[in-house]
Regions:
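Non-catalytic, compositionally simple segments
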Residues: 88, 93-95, 100-217
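Short coil/turn segments at beta-strand junctions that form active-site/ligand-binding loops
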Residues: 5, 72-74, 104
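Inter-Walker segment of RecA-like/P-loop motor cores
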Residues: 20-75
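Walker B catalytic acidic pair
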Residues: 80-84
Length: 217
């Protein structure tokens, strides 16, 4: 990266954006070969930013706004829990600021949310068009963890396997998912959280038992 490069995280609220900053801070402090060089600390970690001192590049966690994210020049940005953003403004502001940036990079991360009308579903729909060859974009890389069939989530283990591939490698996660599924089957009010967060299924709401297939929207 060039000197004075800027990096940002955006999220539905400032607290969540700062969680990204905290995760980066912990990773740096846990990586002595990265954090220090010849006994000198290479990063200055403050409450509102992290600076890489050799190149004076800075990472800043941004609080969500509907009008104050323009004018940034992000070499890279990370947008977290995009499904909870009320509009796509934050993402579009970051992308617009990268117009003159070389080697630009953006990460868009989220679980599903109860409604299909959110910025994350727009990003997922575009990624699927690229994967299906409908749209051409060789700069896009997407990991989409969704079950092929959503109807039999109560009995079909493949729903959880496809939505949580890490459970194939870590038995403790798989055991926890099975407990959460059993609870969601028994307690109707728990289904929305289980299905959206752990199965990546858009669930319309308690009492409806209606699933939305995004291909039909």
């Amino acid at each position: 990266e060039p000197r004075f490069a800027e990096f940002f995280s955006v999220a539905p609220d400032g607290a969540l954006s700062r969680q990204i900053r905290e995760a980066i801070s912990q990773t740096l402090r846990s990586s002595p070969l990265v954090y220090e060089y010849k006994g000198n600390k290479r990063f200055k970690i403050l409450r509102d930013c992290i600076t890489f001192k050799p190149k004076s590049s800075t990472y800043v966690p941004l609080s969500y706004s509907t009008s104050r994210m323009d004018g940034r020049l992000p070499s890279a940005f990370c947008a977290d829990e995009v499904g909870a953003l009320p509009t796509s403004y934050a993402i579009e502001a970051m992308k617009s600021g990268q117009l003159n940036i070389l080697n630009k990079l953006g990460f868009i991360i989220s679980t599903k949310y109860p409604t299909i009308d959110n910025p994350f579903e727009d990003e997922v729909a575009y990624a699927k068009k690229v994967l299906d060859g409908i749209a051409e974009d060789d700069t896009l890389f997407a990991l989409l963890y969704e079950p092929d069939d959503t109807k039999d989530w109560m009995t079909d283990d493949l729903v959880m396997r496809q939505s949580n591939p890490v459970s194939l490698e870590i038995p403790e996660i798989w055991d926890d998912l099975k407990k959460k599924r059993a609870y969601a089957i028994a307690v109707e009010s728990a289904r929305e959280n289980f299905l959206t967060k752990h199965c990546n299924i858009i669930y319309q709401g308690q009492g409806t038992e209606t699933f939305i297939d995004t291909a039909d929207v």
